[in-house]
Regions:
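Hydrophobic alpha-helical membrane-insertion signals
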Residues: 1-31
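Basic, short loop/linker segments at the boundary and entry of helix-turn-helix/winged-helix-like folds
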Residues: 24-69, 74
Length: 440
């Protein structure tokens, strides 16, 4: 008896169009993203299009926001990959509802609205709070180095800049002298009205390179002046007034090894856990206790985590009107000023004084009273039990971002844009996490 197969007619047209939403099973992340965005306040996104005089109608912002959030929540960050997914992936096609924006359109929309995703990030955290999923009483703070959209090979040290500046100045001067000699010869042969081709390409290339190096050198010097001023050093001082030892360099003069990147000048060389020293930004987040949702996020161009904890707590209070009662943080966030501020704010802090596994760290109560108090607290059994929760609370979201989503490098350049993209990443992670918690 012949086998009877199920009907298969790929060329058969449909008499009536199907509901695209039925292509995906109930509880799919795309459904959750679509429903959530429909309830969001997207006024800031629409406001940018009012009265801009466009001839061609732009794509609906709701659709673009859905595509970006779902894309980041599923590990698709590139505008080209997003555009390809809109043609090939069922979930993306359902969210876009028959729209196919190009990768340039997606990239421009993201660039144009990076600053607006902070509001959506805060709004989603508020939704989680109202639903009882997230509470802001106990937070864990952590940071991670995320690669900048720039190569460290495009960076140059201050010492090398000075050498290159001197070399290029000599070469430009020699080329200018040669060009003037040629001009004089041509004037004699063809007359002064003769017009050549302008600056020779060889001279133009060197002049452009010299201008870039001078700009980078000026950025490093401005950064160093700012740093010296913050430490109380004044121009003309040759010795440290506190210790009397002579300074190794003039005020405002960077160290020879200080570097600046030509592609993304605001990024910095930072040590990563796996890839050695890379061009990076320092991405910080504050995580809610049980749900492990991200409730505050920030990006810094400083490699150190010190000074990052209190701004995150203030961001939570500013956005949600509540001050956390407890905060957990690792040794990277420990400094006397921040620990003292926690006490002033009435926040019960558990911040390690040294790296885990290195034994207890002693603190001089006379010089560092806040550190000494913290050391005493962490020496108790209750203090150790509280701090032990930090690892699985704070480090899990960073692991999800880097391993599950695969976000290890910013797609944009500049500190402000990096902050906007980090907000989008944390927003997407929260949406994915909330969908999972709802299903559970």
């Amino acid at each position: 008896m012949p086998t009877t197969f199920r009907a298969y007619q790929p060329d058969q047209g449909l008499l009536l169009p199907e509901d695209m939403r039925e292509w995906l099973p109930e509880g799919h992340l795309a459904h959750y993203v679509g429903d959530l965005v429909e309830c969001m306040d997207l006024g800031a996104f629409y406001a940018r299009y009012e009265g801009d005089g466009r001839r061609k109608s732009p794509y609906e912002p709701r659709m673009m926001v859905k595509v970006l959030i779902y894309g980041y929540a599923t590990g698709v960050f590139s505008s080209r990959r997003l555009a390809r997914k809109l043609e090939e992936d069922v979930a993306f096609r359902v969210l876009a509802a028959g729209n196919f924006p190009s990768h340039r359109t997606i990239c421009e929309f993201r660039r144009r609205h990076l600053g607006d995703f902070r509001r959506l990030f805060v709004e989603v955290a508020q939704v989680a709070s109202e639903a009882g999923v997230a509470k802001f009483g106990r937070l864990s703070v952590d940071g991670t180095k995320v690669r900048a959209n720039a190569s460290r090979r495009k960076a140059m040290s201050y010492g090398r800049m000075r050498e290159e500046e001197a070399r290029l100045e000599d070469e430009v001067a020699a080329l200018l002298e040669r060009a003037q000699s040629v001009d004089a010869e041509e004037d004699a042969r063809f007359g002064q009205e003769f017009r050549g081709d302008g600056l020779p390409d060889e001279l133009r290339r060197r002049a452009d390179r010299l201008a870039k190096i001078r700009a980078a050198k000026a950025r490093l010097e401005a950064r160093q002046r700012e740093s010296d001023d913050a430490r109380g050093r004044r121009p003309g001082e040759k010795r440290d007034p506190r210790g009397g030892r002579p300074y190794k360099r003039d005020c405002g003069e960077p160290e020879a090894k200080a570097q600046d990147n030509f592609t993304d000048p605001e990024s910095r060389i930072m040590k990563t856990s796996q890839d050695g020293f890379q061009q990076c930004y320092n991405a910080q987040l504050a995580v809610e206790g049980e749900s492990r949702l991200v409730v505050a996020a920030e990006v810094s161009a400083e490699a150190s985590d010190q000074g990052r904890m209190v701004p995150l707590l203030r961001a939570v209070e500013s956005a949600h009107g509540t001050r956390p009662g407890t905060v957990l943080a690792d040794a990277g966030h420990c400094n006397e000023a921040d620990l003292a501020t926690l006490g002033e704010l009435g926040v019960d802090g558990y911040v390690a004084l040294g790296r885990e596994g290195r034994g207890e760290v002693a603190a001089d109560a006379g010089k560092h009273p806040a550190k000494a108090a913290m050391a005493a607290k962490l020496a108790t059994e209750a203090g150790r039990a509280q701090y032990a929760q930090r690892k699985w609370r704070a480090e899990a979201p960073i692991g999800w971002i880097k391993e599950a989503l695969g976000f290890r490098r910013f797609s944009v350049r500049g500190l402000t844009k990096a902050r906007g993209e980090w907000d989008l990443v944390c927003l997407a992670l929260n949406v994915k996490r909330m969908n999972g918690l709802q299903a559970a």
